[in-house]
Every structure is written in C-alpha cells, then in structure tokens.
C-alpha cells in the first residue's frame, strides 16, 4: 500500500476512472499553495516542541520513579502514568473538552468562577481560543504520550547496576 500511495502522488486521481500521470505537477501546486508554508512551519513547530516536552517529562518522571523504593507504590504510579497511552485520541479529546468546556459542566471554568478569578458569563472557551489552543495541545499531548517514554527511560535506568551508583558515590 505505501507504494500505491507514492505512485498516486504522481497522478491525477479521478475516482473510478484510470488515474492520469501528471509527474511533479501535484507537488508544484502544493508548494505554491498560499497557506502551505504557514501550515508546514506550524506543524514543524508543534512537532518539535511536543517532542522536547514529552522527552523532558519522560526523563524527569523516570528519574523520580527510579528513586522510589516501595515497589507497590512504584508499580501503581507507573500504571497510572502509562494508562493514558492506551486511550484513543477521540476519548482523550472528548474528556478534555468536557473538563475545559465553557458551560456549567466544565470543571476548569467552574473552579475559576467559584474561586472568583472569572465572573459568571466570562468563561474561557479553551479549546476554541487561539490564545489557549497551543497550550492545551501541548498539555493533552504530554499527558497522553509521556507514559510511553517514561517506561522506556525507566527500563534503561533499571538496567544500570547498583555497583555503578556505589562507585560514583565513592568517586564523588
């Protein structure tokens, strides 16, 4: 199937009719489209920041988990951190949409109104606001994807011999 997709990129696809070979015309049209470079740079920025945040959080959490001596607590914490990885994106976004909803059901806006930070009727539409959207995107991605990286880094840290830690302590 990947080869079929690659070959279709060089054709004018016409549904049930046979595709017509157009060479690089599709790529030229894509690169000349008015919003292409904006979309490309936005995607690149979101991907790089997401990668850095997920890696940083996974390393920090795995270092903290590696220091826990109570195995029952450690395993429970690992499970809780890893669990969001198994949720579908539809469920994840639905849950966050409910939590961040500007209606009376939205937990965050309700807390902000009850704390006196916002007035009733001034609730924030987090998922639809251009000021909040990127932050929410990063929060959701870190919450969902950090568990996987944490497990990988923790497995690596667990493989380090305790004798190396002792030698490092003695060496200073």
PLM regions with names:
Residues 1-171:
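A structural signal for multi-pass alpha-helical bundles of membrane permease subunits
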């Amino acid at each position: 199937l990947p080869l079929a997709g690659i070959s279709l990129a060089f054709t004018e696809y016409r549904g049930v009719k046979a595709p017509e070979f157009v060479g690089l015309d599709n790529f030229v049209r894509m690169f000349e489209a008015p919003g292409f470079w904006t979309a490309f740079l936005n995607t690149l920025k979101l991907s790089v920041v997401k990668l850095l945040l997920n890696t940083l959080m996974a390393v920090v959490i795995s270092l903290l988990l590696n220091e826990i001596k109570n195995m029952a607590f450690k395993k429970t914490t690992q499970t809780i951190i890893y669990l969001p990885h198994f949720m579908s994106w539809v469920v994840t976004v639905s849950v966050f949409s409910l939590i961040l909803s500007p209606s009376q059901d939205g937990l965050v806006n309700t807390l902000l109104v009850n704390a006196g930070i916002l007035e009733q009727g001034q609730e924030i539409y987090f998922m639809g606001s251009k000021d909040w959207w990127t932050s929410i995107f990063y929060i959701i991605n870190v919450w969902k994807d950090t568990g996987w990286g944490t497990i990988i880094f923790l497995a690596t840290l667990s493989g380090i011999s305790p004798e190396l830690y002792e030698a490092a302590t003695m060496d200073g």
